[in-house]
Amino acid sequence: MYKHRMNRAIALGGLVLAGALVSLTAAADDGGSSTPAGVSGKLLLTGGVSEIGGAAGGGLTPWALIGGYGTNDQIGANAFYTRVNAQDYHLDDAGVMVGLYDRVEISFAQQRFDTEKVGGLLGLGNGFTFRQNVLGAKVRLFGDAVLDQDSWVPQVSVGMQYKKNNQDAVVKFVGAKRSQGTDYYVSATKLFLSQSLLLNATLRFTKANQIGILGFGGDKHDSYQAEFEGSVAYLLSRNWAIGAEYRQKPNNLGIAKENDWYDAFVAWAPTKHVSLTLAYANLGNIVIKDNQRGLYASVQVGF
């Protein structure tokens, strides 16, 4: 009962914050095309979109950028919803993020992974769902990916994502050691304005199986492993960007092989207060189903 109440409270808090963000962005738009004083001082699209764990970045991997459009004397925030449809599964993901003075980022996301008919094949029941909460934090150490155009030094940030899965018994049955864990990462991001090109590299230290949906650690490995993640984005205009991502994955479970992830995406930001991202993602093997590919769609609102 307590857990259900906590989950409802968390969800309600997220809805309230999302509603506040929508109200603030609407108010900002009502004020005309000029940027309101004290908010949204960054260039369009330089705050990234929402990664599936809630951090600012690409869809699959966090970037060193601090989310939102707040500069070093401003606060920014985003709320997002993402849907990923593969052949045999789907993922619903929603969350909120606050960026403080272009230095610190705090985020929360809730992921719901629906096994559809595969759940029935596994004896769990059709539509069996894993729910995972992700609490994240990121700190910019040095560099400015946008403003330091006279230097090759990238913006570098460190971050963490604490993840808690609600299906403890199930993930342990498939071989995971635990249903909660923490990822740590370091990201380096550089925007080359004259070439309209953004590059990002992330090194993640993780024990997560399928980003934590299948728990943490396993019969093959139960120690932190360093996994590489990378993104490249090309700015077609001030409102449009295209790009691709790669995310290396660990392989901890003997009965559930795991493959690296890839995607190709297009992002559209008509204003600083809303962005839409569409991607085609290749997720490889997930439990007993190979070649999981599908569409990724995400909407983000904020300032």
Model-derived regions: residue spans:
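Cleavable N-terminal export/targeting peptides
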Residues: 1-46
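A generic signature of intrinsically disordered, low-complexity regions enriched in glycine/proline
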Residues: 6, 11, 249-250, 264
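Transmembrane beta-barrel domains of Gram-negative outer membranes and organellar outer membranes
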Residues: 28-197, 205-207, 236-240, 250-252, ...
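A mid-sequence, solvent-exposed acidic-amphipathic segment
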Residues: 199-247
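Short glycine/proline-enriched turn or capping motifs at secondary-structure junctions
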Residues: 286-296
